């Protein structure tokens, strides 16, 4: 192989191995630094690195499950949100939280279940502020969410050596 071809192959391999640093349509691991496989993120069909509407399901530091809203809106993502999955809408409060814009608070089990098992989701801030395209297809969401939440599975405590009685 010529040195020119070898250098082209090395360059192509290096470019392909770079991490994704943008929000893209569909479900995948979170591209945010430090998140890795602890979070699954689903973004709107027309999402770009500059304009996006995403929802993330994350294994939190305390091994609980968190649902986060992450958008490119100039306003904060904290506030009250109407979340529609398969033509059923419910409202939820979200408080500012890192590394995404806001984390849902209260009972969000309906959101988690429907993100994993639904067909399409929409996010709408109840204050009426404009949103980027927020048609989030849920194809592949079950697989992505289950992989991320595997980190939240209960851990077995280290085995304890039995203490025998002195008379044995």
Where are these regions (language model features)?
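Positively charged n-region of N-terminal signal peptides that target proteins for export
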Residues: 1-6
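A generic "folded-domain core" signal
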Residues: 21-168
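Bacterial N-terminal signal peptides
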Residues: 7-17
